[in-house]
């Protein structure tokens, strides 16, 4: 059993109060691999990747599901092999990510290329390697991809990223489906009345899905009748006396989508169909989202786009990718997404709206990153300066209680190995890892070694009152966006990543050295 639910499954506390990972103490790991140190429980990476693949398949048990691992969360050759063996594809968005995945032996057909500013070289490599999908992110990109594909004498598989207008995510920087940001092509015209899309909620209410309903299957007279009426050719003749008010509202919504930028780009892709194969549409609404509500709203809009494109162009988009953003808990008691429950809710909603629209089942795809790897990682630090600071009467803790003293515990890492607290205000916790410690505790703030007052590792945590220089602190849930967002700020060296399982502990990504820093500086 892990220490608490937020710690890796292979972690424990021994009789001496030491944190262990598959039997190895934190002290022994730092002695062998150095400090700071990223520790990744590779057995749990495998288990969580398999779990998501299985949960998606079980939830959408009447259609095909694809799951891609978002490589931006944590990428190495070993991680690539683990997640692909678990049944995942891999999302990449730079030449570096592409090359690491290919070097790991991942075939192109298991890779996806994202990015809002892809280079010609990245596009060419993805086409040459036969990537499963290139995700188009802006209106001029289809022509660029088509030109490169034509030059290479190949046909590229492409998907359009659509900004649905659904806002989700815990921070503005990770909310990615509103219109005023850099990703994707808008679903609706800029002056459109998005409230007209509320008709999609009425559709769900009209034909509720049973737990065993098939995507695209009509259920009863209401579903069949609606599906038949909406096979009228665009731009819909709504003059028929049997057309209901609900039908008129749906026609208005479809007309609005038909006039939108996303559908225009889909049409443009089809104009290049000799070298571009249009495989679907993509939606990513944000990050660290706790339930399926926003995913359901975005999915409904993607299904409406799919129906509208069928009506205008007689083309059924084969796949709808609903992106990533599935949350994990970073501190004990924090909310996290129950994948089985929330994917089940999402499946029911997608089933229902497709039945109401009379559309066949698309392939449903997902892109988890954080969910698969964040809880598998722990960062180990050596404690340096321990500084009690007296505070005035206005200071409070996060619960609002008065605080008269805070202990600043400095460690040998910081924002160079985990930028998330500084960038997003992300909350973490920490635990003394090398001994039991005193029963008395003090209110502490764990801070890094960098020349920034915002260099905070853990904003608030109670640690043993006898914490001292040389102790080891362990910070859990650092498996995602720690190493991949690390920097050399203050010329700090990026720590090693060590993979650990039941059988061994080994270096996955080596620690940087001073020789590395000096070798990169080629000036005279």
Language-model features: locations:
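A charged N-terminal "starter" segment
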Residues: 1-157, 192-248, 271-273, 277, ...
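Conserved, mostly hydrophobic/aromatic
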Residues: 45, 72, 94, 126, ...
């Amino acid at each position: 059993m892990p220490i608490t639910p937020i710690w890796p499954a292979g972690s424990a506390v021994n009789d001496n109060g030491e944190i262990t990972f598959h039997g190895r103490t934190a002290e022994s790991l730092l002695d062998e691999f150095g400090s700071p140190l990223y520790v990744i429980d590779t057995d749990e990476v495998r288990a969580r990747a398999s779990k998501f693949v299985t949960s998606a398949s079980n939830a959408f048990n009447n259609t095909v599901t694809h799951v891609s691992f978002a490589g931006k969360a944590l990428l190495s050759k070993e991680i690539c092999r683990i997640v692909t063996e678990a049944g995942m594809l891999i999302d990449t968005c730079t030449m570096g990510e592409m090359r690491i995945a290919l070097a790991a032996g991942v075939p192109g057909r298991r890779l996806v290329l994202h990015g809002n500013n892809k280079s010609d070289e990245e596009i060419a490599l993805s086409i040459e390697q036969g990537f499963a999908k290139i995700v188009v992110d802006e209106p001029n990109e289809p022509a660029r991809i088509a030109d490169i594909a034509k030059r290479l004498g190949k046909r590229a598989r492409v998907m359009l990223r659509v900004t649905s207008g659904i806002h989700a995510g815990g921070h503005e920087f990770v909310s990615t489906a509103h219109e005023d940001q850099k990703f994707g092509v808008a679903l609706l015209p800029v002056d459109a009345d998005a409230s007209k899309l509320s008709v999609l909620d009425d559709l769900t209410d009209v034909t509720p899905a049973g737990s065993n309903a098939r995507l695209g299957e009509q259920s009863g007279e209401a579903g069949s009748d609606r599906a038949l009426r909406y096979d009228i050719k665009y731009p819909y003749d709504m003059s028929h006396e049997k057309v209901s008010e609900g039908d008129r509202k749906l026609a208005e919504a479809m007309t609005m989508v038909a006039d939108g930028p996303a559908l225009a780009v889909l049409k443009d892709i089809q104009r290049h169909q000799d070298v571009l194969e249009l495989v679907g549409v993509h939606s990513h609404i944000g990050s660290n989202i706790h339930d399926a509500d926003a995913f359901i709203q975005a999915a409904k809009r993607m299904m409406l786009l799919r129906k509208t494109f069928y009506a205008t162009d007689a083309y059924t988009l084969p796949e709808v990718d609903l992106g990533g953003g599935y949350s994990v808990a970073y501190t004990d008691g924090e909310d996290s997404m129950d994948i089985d429950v929330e994917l089940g809710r999402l499946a029911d909603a997608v089933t229902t709206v497709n039945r109401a629209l009379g559309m066949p089942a698309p392939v449903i795809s997902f892109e988890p990153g954080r969910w698969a790897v964040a809880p598998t990682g722990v960062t180990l630090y050596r404690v340096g300066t321990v500084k009690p600071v007296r505070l005035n009467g206005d200071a409070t803790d996060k619960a609002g209680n008065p605080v008269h003293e805070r202990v600043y515990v400095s460690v040998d890492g910081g924002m160079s190995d985990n930028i998330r607290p500084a960038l997003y205000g992300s909350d973490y916790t920490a635990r003394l890892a090398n001994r039991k410690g005193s029963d008395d505790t003090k209110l502490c703030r764990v801070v890094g070694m960098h020349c920034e007052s915002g260099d905070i590792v853990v904003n608030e945590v109670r640690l043993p009152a006898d914490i001292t220089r040389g102790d080891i602190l362990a910070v859990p849930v650092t498996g995602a966006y720690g190493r991949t967002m690390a920097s050399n700020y203050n010329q700090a060296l990026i720590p090693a990543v060590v993979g650990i399982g039941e059988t061994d502990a080994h270096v996955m990504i080596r620690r940087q050295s001073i020789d590395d820093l000096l070798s990169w500086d080629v000036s005279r």
